[in-house]
């Protein structure tokens, strides 16, 4: 597991958080299925556990602050991201245990982590979510987030 602090979090985080809140407010979430991520008309997806994916494949959107982050990530850990999204957890929402075996590396980056937010569980180990911090790990590892006790836990996720 690798942990890194992103030096430009103050530029990126407010943008991603507002974008995600707007996506959730102004669209109807689709249930998770194979083609949903690549359908241009789909803006949000509900995952098992009821958390909401937004900003689907944001690494391909040509947003300056986002591109800066993904370039930094590639230089820092040598991963070319193939899929990305932002996931928002409100009270009572979670992400069930899963893994991404089709990718060598998975990462989670803290955008908004209110006091009392659930940690990321990676293969049974508790990893506290921290604003501005990337946690990268093998896509082979099972991970989950237990039911949130607060609104607004928001992270950027990607795989490569």
List each language-model region with its residue ranges.
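Non-heme Fe(II)/2-oxoglutarate
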Residues: 1-77
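Catalytic core of non-heme Fe(II) oxygenases with the double-stranded beta-helix
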Residues: 78-147, 151-159
């Amino acid at each position: 597991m690798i942990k890194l602090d992103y030096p430009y979090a103050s530029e990126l985080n407010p943008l991603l958080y507002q974008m995600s809140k707007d996506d959730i407010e102004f669209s109807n979430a689709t249930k998770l299925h194979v083609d949903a991520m690549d359908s241009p008309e789909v803006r949000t997806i509900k995952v098992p556990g009821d958390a909401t994916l937004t900003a689907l494949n944001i690494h391909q959107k040509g947003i300056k602050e986002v591109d800066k982050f993904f370039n930094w990530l590639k230089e820092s850990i040598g991963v070319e991201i193939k899929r990305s999204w932002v996931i928002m957890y409100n009270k009572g929402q979670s992400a069930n245990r899963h893994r991404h075996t089709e990718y060598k590396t998975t990462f989670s980056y803290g955008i908004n982590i209110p006091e009392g937010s659930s940690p990321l569980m990676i293969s049974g180990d508790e990893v506290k979510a921290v604003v501005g911090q990337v946690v990268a790990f093998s896509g082979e590892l099972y991970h989950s987030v237990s039911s949130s006790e607060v609104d607004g836990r928001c992270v950027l996720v990607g795989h490569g």
